[in-house]
Amino acid sequence: MTFEEREAQRAEADSWTAYASKAKGGPAEVTADNGFAALGLPTLLVERLARDGIAEPFPIQAATIPDALAGRDVLGRGRTGSGKTLAFGLPTITRLGDGTKRESKRPRALVLVPTRELAMQVSDALEPLVHVSGLRHKLVAGGLSYDKQIDALAKGIDLLVATPGRLVDLMDRGAVHLDKVEITILDEADHMADMGFVEEMTSILDAIPEGGQRLLFSATLDRGVDTLVEKYMTDPVTHSTDDAQAAVTTMSHHVLLIDPQDKKAVTSEVANRQGPTIVFARTQLGTDRIARELRERGVLAASLHGGLSQAVRNRVLGAFREGRIPVLVATDVAARGIHVDDVGLVLQVDPPRDHKDYLHRSGRTARAGESGAVVTLALPHQKRMMERLLEQAGVDTAPVRVKPGDANVLATGGSAPSGQPIPEEQFRPLIEAAPRGRQGRRTPGGSRGEHHRRGDRRGPRPGGRPSGRRAQWEGER
């Protein structure tokens, strides 16, 4: 057995959905006040959710599911972590359960997402529901085996979860045809547009017959998303709940003005805290450098970015989810695949580009009804820029000058680190350790304790990759 096969086997065995979808026993008791039953969902899906203690829908789910069940086009405005996966997954699975025979290479429903990590999490979240409904689904994304994806498509599936680049690859190869797609979901459409995938999204939507149902979920409607809505959606009903700008009121915000020579010390003091923390850096090299500097000061941190192999990324994410690594230093793109409900603090080592990026980064904390904190480090000459950005983001806080050890630094929940470097021989085993087989935390949101599966490296696309901005996202497709 190859290394890749062993990894895939182990990851599947450890996935909570692999356990849950095969769990035996009678139906769970559905109480009279079950919120999902009131939405008109089939009993088997309501019982499957109840078995995992999921009985009350999130606002985005309660708002969109009835319209989606009725076949309406739906435009959902909600931030990451608001429960969108079940909002589109439950009605889609319900509508697919009409007994229509599946055909080779022709899925009946498509979920399009920006990154492979998000694709994995969507697939894992829907797996028990697909299983109990007697349907088949498949995940196709870069970094996973072409052969397994092509074989599954040839056998016939009902629901396809895909990233834009890999799906276009498979369409070019003749491995999948979209002429039988009845339901199309675009999840985090604004992120796909921001990553340069508008051309791919357009090609995919053009290959799907008119008249089908389309569900689009996006935090914003700029960057080309409004054009997609106008061109491909028919009289969509719009639901806007738990938007990113409103959510900032559930967080505490700190903008710390620091001198350049104090940046490393303040970064380590803020990051040295209890609970999961995500640190944002602008570049791949920056994430590696900051994670290394934190470990040199005694803060256990690992970096995550598109320059790492898929195997390493999966292990780093697993270590972060399981608490073996409490601090994750990530680029904006890599962080879009992180869906962990209990992140207590987001630290921006450099100010974001604009208020929208501030909101997207902030959305990694204060999820699923929890509280959280957002800390931004800025140099004195960036004060006015930060004040404008905060105003645009709807954040009521003022930048303050600080030095290492100041009360305003410690007020973020941090503390002075030990100063004892964490040696490589202590750090590396925490990343390489096998993930613990456990059920993840479950809340009525879009991702409930999902674990990643390991796949092979992505194969080449016929004719090579396009040059320009889209090429830089090769590892994310």
Each model region followed by its residue ranges:
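Walker A/P-loop NTP-binding motif
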Residues: 62-74, 85-103, 120, 125-129
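The conserved Walker
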Residues: 78-82
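Interdomain coupling/hinge region of P-loop NTPase helicase/AAA+ cores
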Residues: 110, 129, 137-140, 149, ...
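Walker B catalytic acidic pair
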Residues: 164, 180, 188, 331, ...
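Conserved nucleic-acid-binding Ia/Ib motif block in the N-terminal RecA-like helicase ATPase lobe
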Residues: 47, 54, 102-172, 180-183, ...
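Pre-Walker A (Motif I) flank of P-loop NTPase domains
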Residues: 70-76, 106-109, 158, 274-276, ...
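N-terminal intrinsically disordered, low-complexity tails of helicases
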Residues: 1-63, 477
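Arginine-glycine-biased low-complexity disordered regions
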Residues: 4, 28, 296, 322, ...
